[in-house]
Amino acid sequence: MTNKITDRIKLGETDIYVSPVGFGVLPMGPGQLALPVETGAELIVYALEQGINFIDTAQYYRTHGYIRRALEMLGGRGERPVISSKTLATDYEQAAAAIEEERRALGVECIDIFLMHELRSGQFAERHGAWRALQDAKAAGKVRAIGASTHHVDVVEELASVPACDIIFPLINYAGMGIRRGRSAASAADMEQAIAKASAAGKGIYTMKALGGGNLAAHYQEALNYAFSRQGVSSVMLGFGCRHDIDDIVSYLDGTMSPDYNPDVSSKRVRVNHEDCEGCGTCIPVCASGAISFSDADGLAVIDQSRCVTCGYCAQACPVRAIIMY
């Protein structure tokens, strides 16, 4: 690993330069840790003070208050962070409204990066209205760069040949957890090849889920060694829930981390994000502990923590990466 946390790396052919690691704010939000706004904002400020300059959110994360408060705390001091956001909008009107909503919520005139969120196989044409809204927002100076986040190899391949696409935010980790091609599982090697193709085409690439939604945290350095050494990747987006998490990544990138160090994950629990769960039932037969069942209320997966042994097999089986550990 050669990049220090204070290094700045160009994203593709844009004029945006980011730290080798970014701060994904989803984990601190209401769907996971539910940190108080002041606490979360202080954590963001701490990360920025350590050298991180890249923050990722999304319309449905409901985490904008943390970022806005952090910017207020900074009061213009230091380097202005690069902010990325995303929308699940499918048509022009929804996407245009989402961009305005995000600008207001974040308290900024221009969002650095704005993406179509979780673009799946075959959806680019279906969501073309939303894509046009992103293009118009860029032309109007409301966003600086546009693209998509995705878990799908074929989407990365498709976007590599879309001239107006500046940025791709794909999922990749050494275990291949959550990587898809169409309706089937794909491998980390498949995604590596797609990323290399997109990078060669001038797309700016930063990646998600290096730690598999927390399920690979017990293999922290192995997972990060893989994530930070992928060809064509400018930055790796990680979630942080406390200062110690940030100190760990600083130590890792500075090369001062002990080779045998791994974070303590004994207090973490496997949980289902019901905003992503589709109730497909793929996770149930792989749980040898019988800890997973369907909720009578909404038909989505639930985990009985008294029976769960945190083996993580369910997370590996989940086709939509709805099972996380925190």
Walk through the language-model features, giving the residues of each.
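N-terminal binding-site loop/beta-alpha segment at the start of enzyme catalytic domains
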Residues: 1-79
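Conserved, mostly hydrophobic/aromatic
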Residues: 11, 23, 47, 55, ...
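Glycine/proline-rich, positively charged
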Residues: 31-32, 68, 90-206, 212
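Conserved short secondary-structure transition element at the edge of the structured enzyme core
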Residues: 48-49, 162, 191, 195-257, ...
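Short catalytic-loop micro-motif centered on adjacent basic/acidic residues
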Residues: 53-58, 84-85, 144-148, 206-208, ...
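Short hydrophobic/aromatic-enriched beta-strand-loop microsegments
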Residues: 79-82, 165-173, 257-263
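Ferredoxin-like iron-sulfur electron-transfer modules
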Residues: 260-279, 291-310, 324-326
